[in-house]
Regions:
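Fungal secretory targeting signals
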Residues: 1-23
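N-terminal edge beta-strand
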Residues: 17-44, 49
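Contiguous segments within soluble domain cores/interaction surfaces
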Residues: 38, 45-91, 129, 134
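Residue-level recognition of well-ordered beta-strand positions that form the cores
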Residues: 42-44, 60, 102, 117
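Internal, hydrophobic beta-strand segments that form the core of beta-sheet-rich folds
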Residues: 96-136
């Protein structure tokens, strides 16, 4: 019985931390991007993260060779941005920051994985959060 209480206590302490995540407002999974045009990445901070200390993010893209996409934990691909993330309040829309990048002509057409890597400090926890999107270019 004490073991169950211990597990419940650990779960209640860990659950709020695991729920702390950032979101991608754009682009969305399956978006088609055109070579020679700019695209905007919108990184959203949910209100539940208002007390989190932001360290930084990286935004990267990797081609899927022969239909096989690399795992973002193994390969980031071309890093488009690595640095501070400072979301600001917008009405409506909450807290977010936009980043704009070009799709250059040397980028291979076809599916690609876009990776948002997030590092933040939540209390005494050190957490990295990774999200990925599949793009068709």
């Amino acid at each position: 019985m004490k073991f169950v209480a211990f597990i419940a206590a650990i779960a209640s302490a860990v659950a709020p931390v695991l729920g702390q995540t950032i979101e991608l407002g754009s682009p969305q999974n399956g978006d088609v991007l055109q070579t020679g045009q700019n695209f905007t990445v919108q990184v959203i901070q949910p209100e539940s993260m208002a007390s989190v200390f932001q360290v930084g993010i990286s935004l990267s893209i990797a081609n899927c060779n022969n239909g096989v996409c690399p795992q973002p934990t193994q390969q980031l691909g071309d890093v488009l941005y690595a640095g501070p993330w400072t979301p600001t309040a917008h009405s409506p829309g909450g807290f977010y920051q936009n980043f704009t990048f070009p799709i250059t002509s040397d980028f291979v057409k076809g599916p690609a994985v876009f990776t948002l890597s997030h590092f933040c400090l939540i209390g005494v926890w050190h957490t990295t959060l990774i999200k990925k999107l599949l793009w068709i270019l």
